[in-house]
């Protein structure tokens, strides 16, 4: 999907509520610095100072819209950034520009960092000749999941399930609580009805076969080494060709190609949201017609 079209996925009401909570967190009371800047009309240039993928425009826009400011973008969502790049301009009352500055930069930097990591992972997978799905996980920051899942999509990865209601995931603790793989999958199938798929986390070929026999749609081979993963997936697919196989656990950008194989359908990576470094952006007010280019430290 075109990155610019992904903004349609974001519910306006949810987006507005998130932005409101972020701004209230940063300034719940008196804003003394507003007396320094004043309320005169001002303009600021948004600069990208590190390479990566630009992501998070809808959040950036929503923050400044709530503060009666206008954003003009010079690069589309999903663009590859080559520093130093002038990405956008923001216009509005000075105290409003500065009130939204840090919240907007934090959101854009984090979202772009995740999109950049996702894009690198997809590129590594395609470079290995693999055409399956690179996906994120539910290992996201509480209260910030919408931004992080959106960043995955801009980077070309799959978001995986958004929340507990998107897929019935039977994990190891569910198996223990239910009293075995078969009982757990049976209960999951009954709960899922015809609307949801059931995925089962497995730590051995035996568990994977039990899960598939019990009716799992997807089998998650968790924390398998590559030399164990591919033989297990081969045997499983031979017996259950319609069952999708997901690999997860300990997968990084460096070792990702080792997990790519003809019997692996999905590779999920927690590091895409947990370890992706934020990109470096700055927002600089300027008085002249041409904004000065910031230095990279």
Swiss-Prot record:
Region entry Important for hexamer formation, spans: 8-12
Record GO terms (molecular function): identical protein binding; nicotinate-nucleotide diphosphorylase (carboxylating) activity
Residues involved in quinolinate binding: 102, 138-139, 160-161, 171, 201, 222, 248-250, 270
Gene Ontology BP terms: NAD biosynthetic process; NAD metabolic process; quinolinate catabolic process
Pathway in which the depicted protein is active: Cofactor biosynthesis; NAD(+) biosynthesis; nicotinate D-ribonucleotide from quinolinate: step 1/1
UniProt activity-regulation remark: Activity toward QA is slightly repressed by phosphoribosylpyrophosphate (PRPP) in both a competitive and a non-competitive manner. Competitively inhibited by phthalic acid (PHT).
GO CC list: catalytic complex; cytoplasm; cytosol; extracellular exosome
UniProt-reported outcome of changing residue 161 to A: Reduced activity
PANTHER family on file: NICOTINATE-NUCLEOTIDE PYROPHOSPHORYLASE [CARBOXYLATING] (PTHR32179:SF3)
NCBIfam families: nadC
Role this protein plays: Involved in the catabolism of quinolinic acid (QA).
Name of the protein in its database record: Nicotinate-nucleotide pyrophosphorylase [carboxylating]
Organism whose genome encodes this protein: Homo sapiens (Human)
The gene coding this protein: QPRT
